[in-house]
């Protein structure tokens, strides 16, 4: 079995506004849900261990959450941040059935270099792909090799990207993932993306204490 980052914690008995005291003690409140737990388990986890694990695997890989001596392989499904201080307020963990595939969204990572005769700017039009795999087989990212591009081939579609063994593509295979564009077109696309990101960032979001959920994982168990 793949080795996972470890985060230690304990069952939480403090709720509501009282969880502020937990944070002052270096504990981050959260909850474990999923098919392997009969009912949601409120937890408090070590703040520094969680932050290290989150920065290392994000929402793309499993973390071993050890609660009172019991280990739960979990995905970090949602992290709520304070809208001003960006302090982590609450975490939702998802404990999957390791024997059943899950459908998740993972980021795209470009590797390799363009051939010298390919002129233009590489744009990632689809930064994430939806895939299906067993929880322990979910890759941290999907690599897209830029050396496959040429003067005749300026686009890479989702269905053309090689996937690791045991991983199936759920995204439409005809979706454009990477494209070589002229500089002016790339700048216009980048500006449109920036404006959209600012508009999304300005939208009000409801969560604990006005928190803004980040990195909400598109994750579900496959039928």
UniProtKB/Swiss-Prot annotation:
Record function comment: This is one of the proteins that binds to the 5S RNA in the ribosome where it forms part of the central protuberance.
GO biological process: translation
CDD domains: Ribosomal_L25_TL5_CTC
GO molecular function: 5S rRNA binding; structural constituent of ribosome
Quaternary data: Part of the 50S ribosomal subunit; part of the 5S rRNA/L5/L18/L25 subcomplex. Contacts the 5S rRNA. Binds to the 5S rRNA independently of L5 and L18.
Protein name, UniProt field: Large ribosomal subunit protein bL25
The species this protein was found in: Thermomicrobium roseum (strain ATCC 27502 / DSM 5159 / P-2)
Positions of region (Disordered): 198-223
HAMAP family: Ribosomal_bL25_CTC (MF_01334)
Cystine connections: none
A Pfam short name: Ribosomal_TL5_C
Cited InterPro entries: Rbsml_bL25/Gln-tRNA_synth_N, Ribosomal_bL25/Gln-tRNA_synth, Ribosomal_bL25_b-dom, Ribosomal_bL25_C, Ribosomal_bL25_long, Ribosomal_L25_dom, Ribosomal_uL5_bac-type
Cited Gene3D superfamilies: Ribosomal protein L25, beta domain, Ribosomal Protein L25, Chain P
One Gene Ontology term, aspect cellular component: cytosolic large ribosomal subunit
Family matches, as SUPFAM superfamilies: Ribosomal protein L25-like
NCBIfam families: bL25_bact_ctc (TIGR00731)
Lineage: Bacteria, Pseudomonadati, Thermomicrobiota, Thermomicrobia, Thermomicrobiales
Family in the record: Belongs to the bacterial ribosomal protein bL25 family. CTC subfamily.
Keywords in alphabetical order: Ribonucleoprotein, Ribosomal protein, RNA-binding, rRNA-binding
């Amino acid at each position: 079995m793949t080795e996972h980052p470890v985060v230690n914690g304990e069952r939480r008995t403090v709720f509501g506004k009282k969880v502020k005291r937990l944070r002052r003690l270096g504990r981050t409140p959260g909850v474990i849900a999923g098919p392997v737990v009969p009912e949601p388990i409120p937890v408090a986890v070590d703040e520094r261990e969680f932050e290290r694990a989150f920065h290392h695997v994000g929402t793309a890989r499993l973390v071993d959450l050890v609660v009172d001596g019991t280990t739960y392989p979990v995905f970090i499904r949602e992290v709520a941040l304070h809208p001003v201080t960006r302090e982590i307020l609450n975490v939702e963990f998802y404990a999957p059935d390791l024997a059943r595939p899950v459908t998740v969204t993972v980021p795209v990572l470009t590797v390799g270099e363009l051939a010298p005769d390919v002129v233009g700017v590489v744009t990632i039009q689809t930064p994430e792909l939806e895939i299906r795999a067993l929880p322990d087989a979910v890759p941290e990212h999907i690599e897209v090799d830029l050396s496959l591009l040429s003067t005749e081939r300026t686009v890479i579609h989702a269905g053309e990207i090689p996937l690791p063994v045991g991983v199936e593509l759920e995204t439409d295979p005809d979706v454009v993932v990477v494209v070589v564009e002229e500089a002016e077109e790339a700048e216009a696309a980048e500006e449109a993306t920036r404006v959209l990101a600012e508009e999304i960032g300005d939208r009000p979001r409801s969560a604990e204490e006005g928190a803004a959920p980040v990195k909400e994982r598109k994750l579900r168990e496959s039928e």
